[in-house]
């Protein structure tokens, strides 16, 4: 193989790698936060997503949630409820269930760790025991938690 052909082949390979063969962010479901709850031995997971199709100004959100026997099952069922590919690269908040012990926190952290890459920082909160309607409360919980971080200059993230 001559040098020009090898160079051309390498150029084509590099172009294919860098051309964005995947979907653009505007075509993906962008996950901003994940909330976990545990009730009666079952887990529920709620994904708070940036609603890129909202027509009003400002940040708009939508949710997808599901219940499962384990946190992983609940998370996967919530993901499967969405039509597009998920993008966790902008995930910046996770909320753990009330009464979460260290072992549960490690399990949930491991579950999110691979998905959240390359998120620069992931803040972790523990929910209180109040009942939550994910569809109604997830966006306000997220905004309240982010406001607390900013107001009190909290830095409770995993980097």
Stretches with model-predicted labels:
Residues 2-14, 18-159:
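Membrane-proximal alpha-helical signals and transmembrane carboxylates
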């Amino acid at each position: 193989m001559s040098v020009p052909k090898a160079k051309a082949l390498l150029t084509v390979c590099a172009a294919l790698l860098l051309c964005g063969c995947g979907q653009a962010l505007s075509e993906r479901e962008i996950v901003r936060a994940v909330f976990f709850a545990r009730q009666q031995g079952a887990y529920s997971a709620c994904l708070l997503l940036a609603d890129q199709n909202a027509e009003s100004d400002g940040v708009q959100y939508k949710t997808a949630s599901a219940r499962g026997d384990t946190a992983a099952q609940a998370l996967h069922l919530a993901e499967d409820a969405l039509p597009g590919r998920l993008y966790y690269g902008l995930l910046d908040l996770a909320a753990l269930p009330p009464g979460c012990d260290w072992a549960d926190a490690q399990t949930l952290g491991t579950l999110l760790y691979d998905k959240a890459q390359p998120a620069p920082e992931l803040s972790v909160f523990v929910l209180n025991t109040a009942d939550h309607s994910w569809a109604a409360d997830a966006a306000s919980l997220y905004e309240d938690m982010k406001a607390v971080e900013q107001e009190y200059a909290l830095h409770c993230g995993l980097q």
